[in-house]
Amino acid sequence: AIMKHLMTSADSVFVIDELGYLESSCIPFQENIKSLLDNSRVLAVIRKQSTEFLDSIKSRADVLLIDIDNIFSSISCIIMASGMSKRFGTNKLLASFNNNTLFENAINISHFVSFGKTLAVTRHDELVQICEREHIHCIKHNMPYRNDMVRLGVSRILKETNRHKSCCTQGILFLTKTSLQLLCLLFIYYNSSYFACNSTDKSSNANNNYFNNNNINNNNKICRLAFNENAGAPVIFPECYYNELLTLPQGKGGGFIAKKHPAQVVLVPAQDEYELYDIDTPDDLIRLSRYLR
């Protein structure tokens, strides 16, 4: 099957359901796998066993290795929940949606990914109580500006973790599991040593073919969810932007940094336009609820 693929369809992806201990004893098979990796794109499941054969695959410079048991632990999630909801009339994060509050919905969405740490930043006592009930770490504050809230969240992440990458998640009220996981997976891909060694093109858009080395040659990528190239939230920043996150201009959030470094931004396609919606008024929430029925 491998030789037929290389002769007839080497440009397509060859899928291997498992490479493990048994394959380590067959030299001809190992040679075919090496030829396959040298000449075609491959998607393979590989066991965590340590053998000379498996280790040689995992150590290749052109292999992106993802540990599915620990895939997103290097990313921390910061839920920004300090808005005053002036146009809504009451705290919109306490409004009912799908038998939960909007804030509880955001917490549930954050569970779609096994983040290394999840943290909420809020000024509202009611949201602190929800965090305590849901076992979510929380910072209660009375700071006036968005940049203050970003600084509080990032500072806590840096203090309590080993330099985790930061995910500012304001605007995740309606994300699907697929979109959030894709955003995090592409962040890991674009900020991996594999991508840094193999990227050539300077495109900043991931919508067309986001696994085809189409960004500039470094691993300082900001990944941002978008729909039809219209950027939204959440946004994930690698650690090289921590100082900028800690020193944002008054009233600015993470989007300010993304706009400052457009060549470093990868737009990750959301599954549906509604995932990027924000709720400013009760009518907005009613319209969205009807749309999702």
Set out the residue ranges of the language-model regions:
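N-terminal glycine-rich phosphate-binding loop and ensuing alpha1 helix
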Residues: 75-125
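ATP-dependent small-molecule kinase phosphotransfer cores
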Residues: 1-11
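Short, polar loop motifs at secondary-structure junctions
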Residues: 47-51, 122-127
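Conserved beta-loop-beta/alpha segment of the NTase-like Rossmann-fold superfamily
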Residues: 143-246
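Conserved donor nucleotide-binding strand/loop of the catalytic core
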Residues: 132-146
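Conserved alpha/beta core of the MobA/IspD/sugar-nucleotide pyrophosphorylase nucleotidyltransferase superfamily
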Residues: 243, 247-293
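Hydrophobic positions in the central parallel beta-sheet of the AAA+
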Residues: 14-17, 77-79, 235
